Each structure stands twice: as structure tokens, then as C-alpha cells.
């Protein structure tokens, strides 16, 4: 809506001032005038609004963003209140500026309303942003000299400025202005359409206002009156004067009345007039609008106005456009009323406004009036001209506020928040058709314009039998063509901790997804937790997948353990998260063909929402199922011709299916820049919608596609004409291509008169499907990779889809329509641009002379491959920067156990070193799997360094420098001189500093070096200091603070300076043992200062004594040299200071307990306690001998240090590490920190390379941090996989023949004759039996099947009442209750008149093959199924089986039951009679045990003690299970007094399990508590019993006595048998006969009894045995572990044939024989020891099964391999590697 009242101005402004040169507006001599006109700035409104929105994303423009959000919310609220007829005219909008692009809306009935609202929004957004952006001009609008003026709707904008005391108030007040403008526009529209009906075409109609130049108002009014009288015009329809100026009159009225006026009026007919662009309706009409109209707009009771009135008020005067006087309102709502009334009812007289401004300027006595405008306009020019009148004492000038919007951003300030961020793509990888195993090969296909289609390969299916072009054969494809990945089965399973079996059963697309994820992460320079954006919990995975071919066809032929985890889609991204330990979200997304790009959109949203900081995203598709080919062919989706997609071809007849796996790594742009990543491309916006209005679900819709594109361009604040390339979906279908090209040209290449592409703005389009086919779920990701490669190569590859002529359905005017890169896909689209260009400043360049290049791998094969790849890269790029290469291979790579590191200064040297390592790669040893080697810090004493140093580390390393400066400040604060001149190169090397400076400098260097090493992640486990270096060692060990260390060293040095003469004594180093020195000294005097090594001795004495001694010793052939020290330490020269030194240490220093072991050269021992180091120690260490040799030898003897440790010398030159090597000849490694005369960085590089290769984890990122601005991540070769083929081939043609009704008809006939079909479902339910799912009864035969959920409260409580290893375990007493329940139910159903109860039923032959452990997650069910059946109940026998059930209720009844038992029907009387003969024997043994207890021979235990011991050994029972009141135990025999406890929890039981357990678990107590069993190293569990009968019911509170004696069996000494007798008074009422227990090594307890849902799969675990049962519910244990019930152990599972694994052709060499110290040799030693065989029996061709290695022994050996060798495998190890050769080869390859 616009109420313009003057001719549109086309002249430039007269006087302008740019914002950058504006003087301070607080100057009282200057007046500010804010002018808000009634027309948009002359800039392109689309561009202006887009720029404002873009600026709102900037972190500096938070108020601008707030205003846009508040104004948008206000308008949305108003839209919701509109009547439906108007509400439907306004489309959904993301922000108010989104409405700018809706041309139909702005030119439609509500055009005036929308434009009026947009005018206020643009003005206020520009105004707010101007003040946020300006560094010179500030928001001071409440001085007495400021004033405001406006025209039309712009007058409303002045309210926000007038009432806002600060800029921060303007977003809210501005939003209210926008709300008022919208309401005003709606009112004017509604009133005006009553005066004149809208046009039938819905367009804007004609103008409601004409300007008549050179007219006189009185004459105009007279003519109007005459016209109205003649026409008898109704009052409301009269034409009237709406505005006056000195040069013109503006008349307004209904458009038809205006036209009529100019046709019939003599006065107007011949006059010049100008129709104004006022199409929204009538304003300034007092005869039309009333007070009620004003009230409808300004509702003073609305919450928003009430809030504003309560805290704000008008402050800056606004001049009324009618009389030029300031509005007098005192409230915000009052001011709005004044202005709305002005706009609706008052005439505009601009000259009055000008006069009002002039009078205001005169009153404030200003010298200058500055008019702030939004570009130039006639009213503003008239105002400035008037202000510049010669008669006035001031001058006027304008200042345009718009230029800040259109200026380029001076420097990147970053987005306001995550939602405004751009998304950087920092890594990518792929496996695509045509041999494109990397992005380089993919680009070759694109650049050469190749079409890589081919016939379906044989490894997918037989194309001859599964393809029929005629379409006559059932279930066949019409086309034999596709685009396929070469060898999709190749995979490095051990690298990803997968067994061969798991790899074969895992979908190859999921395998390739994790491979490309690793490669993409590697190319992105990802290192876990290196930066804030790489924290593991902030990384998520997002993959598109639209099919499960491999699971449906390949692995479905032989369903195994990993059928679900290896085949279901959700496990693909989940596996990536699991392997990399990402704990962010993992999504598998299926949106058909847009899956790959929809996934990118979801990943972007995750980054924008702040849910993640890094996203691993992509798509995957590997085609193996002929069904999809057949179905797509039948649906007319696929092309029948030999080609990839014929995109845009006139004969396009469908698409060509394709494989593909692609991964990209994404971060927010500012994070990528902060992380120093390579930015391959930047995503500005992304969106997804659906073609809801398409003619079918598979048909695209141009309108929806165009809507989506406009939406994301709006989000990105990008002009469509700035887009130069569009990558299209381009499937090669007639309808799809035509619809898509239409949506593209509509948005990116319009032909409108106001917006079209210039000649220099060509638009290019392309579609990658023409090269590599349609990858379906990976199609979008593939196209994204293409565009990223185009950005890298700065080339648009040729399009090869048009084989004949262009699609005739395309627009005919493409040439006339002459994309920032835009990337557009179906109904998911993203906008891409190139990444920021980064340059390296001279000040950022890396000055280090030497660099570390690291190579690592998980296997020897890959190590060789990685070395070869890097060598080839260097040969191809000889000018590569070693700076960047070192940074890339160290800080930006993950490091594996096979490590090589080279410190180098030139590429040729590096190549030679790498070739040398390549030659020796076969004998290379990996770092220990037990972890990084421990580190010893050894601190140098005096005499090793130059007198003055120039430390490069002090110059370059902020860490080292800050530490040195901090320590220097401590020195000076304690009154010592500065040490910095001794280290910063201020003096020449031979300059001698005072001893205080020299000694303090040495110690401070060492302290700073420790801080530096620790910043690299290298920390000591032991410390030792030599002489003065011991002070630094004491600090690092925590004994002395840094301040106390400096205090002691400085005070000691000052004492020496004060009390000892410099140069009077010397220290002499001799290359000989002390004995040899003494024998060759010929009696010359000396003192022994240091014993450094077996042949390194330092002597002290006076100068003359040392010179004479040196001469004598050198004549004897010994090498001697004088140390460059001021004093002879550890000699009589130091005696004068000793007492004072001890007193100083006693009073001035606080000694703390050591945190680390300290090797003491003074005491020749290792210090651990807090008392040894004290003031006396400090004194003695100064005077007495440094016995470094004895100290290290003592530490070695105590195992404080050993040969595996890494020794790092902390000091200015390596001295002590030489001593260490002479003492420990086999020491692993010794390295220096600095070396005299060598650049610090060179020394450190060499040392870091060595310790890294030895296994010490170095924080390389920290090492490179000082130079990171000058470092770049190189795109070097990715990991060389040790690939083998893992592939389950689809066999036969069952995919074709399955399409019949044979099985359906068979199932129907079987169901019709089955007694189960009509059987009713019973209401039977107890605490342990929950649901009868089937039952059938026929004569004396019957069957009942029930299911129970272990997670139900009663069942769960029963299981958790019997805890083992911290887990709830289903005791056999639970099985007994279930058996008796079903036994009675079956009998009652078949024999309703039977009077038998459970006391008449025997549970026999209970065999528990798998223990049931309650899972931890109680939110999902844990189901079991139990069946009971009998062919003839009169036979007295029924059979029971227990099976696992999947969570969705699918029974595993086709597998071996986990528990079996029988019910035998008898009579209680017979049972009781049969036990009478045994009664006296049992009672006799009970009396004998009681007597033994009285004699102190047997143990009598109370209830609490018994169960305390039971819990300590194995089972922790809940209170209601604890029925044994006392126990008498002797050897393997015991009796117990039992009292059963009531069920306070109200369960429904047949025989409560805690009753059964209470009277029977005495046997388990004996087996796990008795001292006759080695319970420390073993535990015993029962696999079942022979018979359980209870001839009397067990009752709550009943008192019973149990007796048992266990005996080992003759066949197997690990198996024990016994009978448990239950007595009530003098009667045996129950017997558990043949209760069996088996002994197991305690090391297996955790393996057997851990809930399945919290077991951690081993990192290198092997798969289960072929055919082995897989159940989430059961623990693969030898038996149920209830102590009250026994079972035979399962037989060993026969070893299967190994999974066929095809090696690469080059990988055919036989493995080397295992060295005696290799991991393989140690593992075989362990196997031999455990199997009790000779090592010589383990020949290569021997199978482990033949040696008696059964399933149990496998579990024991697996556990010991983990504990002793750090190798984690599953118990199926010997099934995967059945022979000695198989195992040795595997261990040699991956663990040697």
C-alpha cells in the first residue's frame, strides 16, 4: 500500500553524506531530521531485502535479526486473525521479507497492504542495521534538536524512533509499527473495495490518486463540487483533494470516478496529470473514515500496546503532514492514533511540514540540519532546499542510510548463531561405478564424458536367466543394464574389528559406507577430540538407503548370527557411530531417490540446530536383487537401451540403475575455518518438499520444485540470477526432465521485463546420471560430489546424456533465457558456493628447519601400502611443502599400532627414508597392544649448555615462552635477576652470566620444558634429576612448588657467590670407572662428585689438584675434560654454604609428598614417601656424591623402571640419557629435548618422531599450534586397505520361482485340518506364565504353548532375587514352578475329573542348556516360550521345552530348546513310601554332622553368615529366598534348618520358586562355599537334575530340614552329583535326585553371566560358530546357574569349515614363521599350557578340535588371551581359525 502524493523522482539527490564520513551527531550545533517517505528506495527491492536478511545472520546485527523475527511474528499473528477470504490470499512465509518475492501477492488485491507493511519493515531494518553497523554514528535521537517527518505509511515508521529511548528498544517498537501498517492496509482494502469492486482478474487495478501540476487548490475544489453536483455523486464516492504543494494538487477517489472526471470535466480534460502508483485504496478521506475505523486499527487494550504504554512514551517530535505541527500525544498508543487518523482523514500539505522543521531548527539554534533519508526523493529534496535558504542561519544536507546495506562485508565476523551458519564440506570419499574408487577417478569419468553402463555382473545375479526383454517370463527384468561398482565385496574386516563371518553377513553397502566414512574423515584431517567440533559426543552420522538387496536375497539364503545387524538399514550409520565411538545421532533415511540429498539436508539441520558440530553424511546403494530390476521395469521406470541415463534426450525412456556409496564430512563454516580444514564447498541453504499436486506419486511437479528452489534461495539470501550452474536430477524420463527444466527456467532464467539474465550471466545445467546412472539413494550424494569436484577443478564437465536430440518437451526459448553454484535435486535442493580463499602471510610461515612425517597402519600389508602410496605421491609432487606434509601426517591423521615416523628437512631424504622402511616393513614390530610405554623424565645438571642460549622454542612456542616469562617473574619477585637474557639470544654464546642467572636459567628451562612436553600429552611416570637438575625433578614430582624451587636454587647460587670463590675449584669428567681412576691417580687428591655411568666419573677439587690429576690420568690413556661450571659442586668447596642452605630450606620451603616416584642419585634408591626429601636432603645433595649409576640400577632392580620405558632428557643438552644407555644397554629409547648447537625444533622433531614410533601418544595438534596459521591440510593418499572379498553369492533362480501360491495353499490346507485352528485361547495366567498362545486337546493327547515376559514385575523380581555377577538370573526353581503349572493345566484339561495336584507330579530330567539372564533395559520385553505336550496322558509322561522369543513375538522354536524337562504323573503316597527306607540314613548323617559341629570340626553358620558367604562366592539372594536359618557344613556334606518366607509381594505361584530354592539350594551352597572346592579360582553351577518330587506342599512359614552330600563323578572330576532330601519333622517330604554341578574357572563368570544387552562386543572379536543359536535373551553359558537344580554340559560344537575369504592377488605370500617372542608364539604357548599338551604338538596342520580344545576350553583360552596378551576375541576363535596355521597367520598379520 502506498499513499504517494507527488510525482516519482528520478533526479539524483542534491547533497549527500556517506555513513563512513558522518560527524558525531551528538554535537548540539547540529540537528538530526529523520525522514521516512512513502516510497521504497530506488534499489531493487528483492536485492535490498535479501541483503538485509543476510546481514541479520551476522553476529553484529542481533537487533536487526530480532526486529525481523518480531515483525514476522506480529504479521503472522495478524494473518491468523483475518477472515478466511483474505487469509488464503497470503502464502506461508519464513520472514516478512520472503513476501517480496511473491509478485502475485504484491500485485494482487492485498498488494497495497503488503507493500505498506514492507515499506515500514525495510525502513526500520535499514535504520536499525545502520546504527548497529556504524562505528562513528551512535543512536542519540532524544536530544532537543532531533525531529522526525514522514509521508504516507512512512509516517508510521517515525513512531518507532520517537518512542525508543535506546536502539535496543526498536525491534519491539518497530514490530508494532509493522503490525499497524498491516492493519491499516487491510482496513483501506476492505473500505475501498466497498467504494469500488476489485477487478475481475484479481490484478492491482487502476490508480486511486492523480497529481495535477500547476493547479490551484480553490479552482480544483470548485470544479470538483460542480462535477459532483452534476453527477449527483454519493458522498462516499466523491473525488477529493488529498494533498497540496506549492506546485501541484493531488486528487483521490475511486478509479472509475477519477477517469470519468478527466473525461467530462473541461477543467481537467486538457490538464496534464500523472496517475500515482496507489493501488491499495483510499486514504486522507475524512468523508469516508471515522473514529471507529481508527479504533479498529489502534486497539489500546491489546497486550502489545499496553506493554509499550507502560514503559515508553513519545520523545522525539513528529511533524503532522496536515499542519506541520508536532503531535501532542503523551503515550505510544496515543501517537499511533494521531498518525493513523492523520493518514485516514487528513490532507497532506508538505509545505507545512517544511515550515515546521525550519521553525524547530530556529528554536534550537543549530548551525546545520542533517536529513537522514532512504535514498533520494522529491519531498526530501524540497526539505533540504528549504533548509539551505540564504535567509536561514543554518545549512541542510542529506545523509543516505541505505549504502551500508549494499556495501561488501569488510571482514568476516561470523554468523549470529548456529542457525545462521553456512555449512562447510571438508571431506569426501566414494565408491562409484566405472572403477571410481576415489574422487579422482570419478572426476576422470566426468571430465572425459564417459558413460559407464554395463551388463549386470555375475556376482549380482545371472542376467541371462533373470532378464527377458520380451517381458513374457515372470519376475524378470526388461533390461540387462546398469552401472556397477567394481568388486563391492572388497573389505578390510580386521581393521573394522569384524570377523570374516560378520563381514560376509554384513551388507556390502554398509561396509563401503564405513570405508568411505573413514576415507572422508581422513581427507578431512579428522582426529577425535582435536578441537571443539570434533568431540565424539558432538558427531552424528546420516546416510540415505532405500533398499536391502543383500539382506533380502544374499544372506537370506542362509540366515546367520549377523543377518539383522548386518542387513537392517539402521545398523549402517549405527555401525559407523559404534566404530568411531561417535555418540551423536545416527540416522538411516529413506526418501526414495532423494534419500542421499535429503540426508544432507537432515545433517545440515542437525548442524544448524546445534545438535551436532560435525556430520558424516552420504548415501549408499549396492544392487543385488533382481526383484527391484523386475519391478522397476514393469513400472516403466527403466530404460531398455544400453546406456546410462539419457538425460534430456528426445528418446529418453527411463533411467539406468546404479550402485554407489558416497560420504561427505560437514561442519559449520566458522568451525571448519577455526579447525584449519580444507573447505571443498559451502552449503548456504537446504530444503525438502513433496510434489503433492503431481498427477501421480511418481510424477514430479514443476511448481513444487520451483517453490522449493525459491525458498532455499531466500534462506541463502541469493539472487537466482547470481547462480551460474544447476546440477539437476536428470533421470532421463520424458515427464521428469520436462517438469524439472520448467522449474529451473522459471526460477533461474525468467523472461520477465524486470528480471532476466544478462548476456554475461549464462546459466549452465548438468546431470551426473548421464555418466554413472541413477544411484537412487546415493544419487543426490553423487551429484553433490560432482559439484564439489567442479569447484575444485574450476571446470564444468561435458553433459553426455543427449544421445540424439534434445527433449522436445523443453521450453523453446532457452537461448533467450540466457547458477554462487546452485545444486538442485528433485524435491530436495541445496545451494552451494565455493569455500573461502585462504592465503598464508609471511608472518605466519613455518620457520622450523625439520619436520616429522608419520605413517601408520593396522597391519603390515597396509603399512607397506601406505608407504608405497606416500612415496608415489612424493615422486609425483616433488615440490610439496614438508611443512604441510608433516602437519597433515601427524596432527591430522589417526595413528595406528604399526608406526613409522621420519624427521626430515628435504623431500629426497624423506623418500629415501620411506623406501628404507618399506624394505624392512615385513619385520616391523607394532607398538604393544597393552598401551603406550611409560616415560621417565631425566633432568640435566650444570655444564652441558652454552653460557648464553638463543632458544628457538622461546621465540616460537607460546606455551614455552609463557612458562619462561612466568618463571622469570617469580625469579624477579624474589629479588633475583631476570633469566631471560640468558635464553633469548641477547648475548653471544660465550657470554658468561652470573652463577645465579645461569643456575636459575637452567632450572627454569627445565620446568618450562616439562610444561611443554605435558602440553604435547607426554607426562612422566618416574623422574630423576642429576645434581642441579634434581630441583626440577622434585618440582615435577610435586615435592616443591615452582616458587620454592626457584627460591632454593636462587638462594643457593647467591650463597655460592657470596661464600665461595669462582674459579678456585674445578670439576673433572673422566671416561673411566672409579676403580680405574683410583688405580691410575697415583695418590693424587680428588673428591668423587658424580658416578654417572659404569665408565663415567666426575671428580672435584682445587684447580691445581684437578689439572695435575688430569695430566696424570691422560698419560695413563684416560680421556678427561673440565666441566664449564663456576663452582665444584659435591666437593669441599660447597662446605661454607651447607649450614645456611639447610636453614633456608628448613624455614623458607614447604615440602609436599611426592606424586611420582623419584629416583634419588643421592640415596641410590627410589623415593615414594613424604619424609625423605627435606631440608637435610637438600643440603646433602649439594655436598655429597651424585651416584647416578647406583640410583638407576636400584630403580631397575625394584622394577620402578625397565627396558620398555622411554627416557626423555629435560635440559639444554643430552647428557644423562647417555648415562642411562650405558647402565641399561637394552633400554627401549632415550631422547633429548634440546641439543647444544642445534635448532630446538630439529631436536624436538627427531625426538618426537622417535617416541611417537615407540608408541607414546603425542598431541601433534599442540606441537603445530604456533604455526597453524601457516599450515595447510594436504590431500594426500588415503589408507591402503588390506582388502579381501567377503561376499555371499546369490545362487539359483529362486527369486524368479518364488512368485507362486504353492506355499500359500499348503499353509491354508494345513491350518484347516489342525486342531489348533479352532482351539480357544485360555485365560491361564500366573506370575511366571503370562499368555497361552496355542493349545489343542484331542482325546488323551494335548499340547499347550505359553509365552512369558521376563520384564514383567513378578517374573523380574523372581529373577533378580537370584543375582550372579550383578545380574538377575533365572534359577531352576523358576523353571520348576512353570513346569508344575503347565503339568497341572495339561492334566486338568485332558482329565477334568482328575484329583491330582502338583504333589503327585515329578519333574524329571531337567536339562538347562543356556542360562537366562535378565536384560538391563526394562523398557523392551524379554520373552520366552514354553510348550508342554503329551501323545497320551495315560502314559503318565508329558514333555516340556523352553525357547527364546524375539522381542516382536517370533518364536525360535525351530532351534534347539534352551531348557527341556519331563512331567511324570504319579501319586504323593507312593513317593512318601519310597523314601521311608532312606530316612534313618539321612537322619544319621544329620546327627553325625551336628556332633562334628559341636566338636568344632564342622562349621555351624548362621543365616546371615551363610548368605554372606554365598553372596561373596557366587549368588546374592533376595530376602525371600534366604530360607536357610542355619547351616552345618563339613567338606561336601551339609544340612540346613529352613523356614520358608511368606510372599509379601502378592505373586501368583503354583509352587513359589523361593520356597523351592530355600529347601534345595543347600547343594549350591556346598559347591560354592565349602573349603573342599577351590572357590577362589572356580565357581560351580548346575545344569539340571534327574528328578524333583515334593510329596507335601511347601507352605509359607513352614519349617523344614535339608540334607545333601555331593560327590565327584568318576567320568569327569569337574562334575559333581548329589541328592537333596527335604524333611518336615521326621518325614522325608521331598527329594531332588541326581542334582548335578559343574566346576568352571572363575575367569568365565563375567562371560557367562552378563546381560546380553550390555555386553561389549570385543574390538577384535570373531563371529559365533556356524549354525550357533543367536538370542538376545539367553547367555551362552553351560547351564542355568540356579544352585538348587542340576544339568549336563553341552557337547563341544564341531569346528566348521572356515568362511571362504578371497585375498587380493598380490597377497599370496606365505606368512613368516612366528618368532619365539612374537604374539603368535606367546598365544600358542598359552594354548599348549591350558590344553596340557607339548608345544611340539602344535604343528601347522593340526586342528584344535583334535587336541581336545572344546567350547569350554575355547572360552577359557579367549579370556586368558585378553588378560595376558591384550588380544580380545570371542569364544568362537577356534571355529573361525580351526587349525594352528590359521590362528598363527592371523595373529602374525594383525598382532605382530
Swiss-Prot record:
EC numbers, comma separated: 2.3.1.-
Reaction catalysis annotation: holo-[ACP] + 8 malonyl-CoA + 8 H(+) = atrochrysone carboxyl-[ACP] + 8 CO2 + 8 CoA + 2 H2O
Domain Carrier residue range list: 1714-1791
Effect of disrupting the coding gene: Impairs the production of neosartorin.
Enzyme class at the top of the EC tree: transferase
Disordered, as annotated region: 1-21, 1658-1715
Region (N-terminal acylcarrier protein transacylase domain (SAT)): 44-284
Active site as annotated: 593, 729, 774, 1362, 1557
Pathway in which the depicted protein is active: Secondary metabolite biosynthesis
Location of the PKS/mFAS DH domain: 1330-1646
Source superkingdom: Eukaryota
Compositionally biased tracts (Pro residues): 1687-1699
Residue numbers spanned by region Malonyl-CoA:ACP transacylase (MAT) domain: 937-1256
O-(pantetheine 4'-phosphoryl)serine PTM sites in chain numbering: 1751
Region (C-terminal hotdog fold): 1497-1646
Physiological role: Atrochrysone carboxylic acid synthase; part of the gene cluster that mediates the biosynthesis of the tetrahydroxanthone dimer neosartorin, which exhibits antibacterial activity. The two different monomeric units appear to be synthesized by the same set of enzymes, among which the Baeyer-Villiger monooxygenase nsrF is the key enzyme for the divergence of the biosynthetic routes. The pathway begins with the synthesis of atrochrysone thioester by the polyketide synthase nsrB.
Record-given protein name: Atrochrysone carboxylic acid synthase nsrB
Organism, scientific name: Aspergillus novofumigatus (strain IBT 16806)
Name of the gene: nsrB
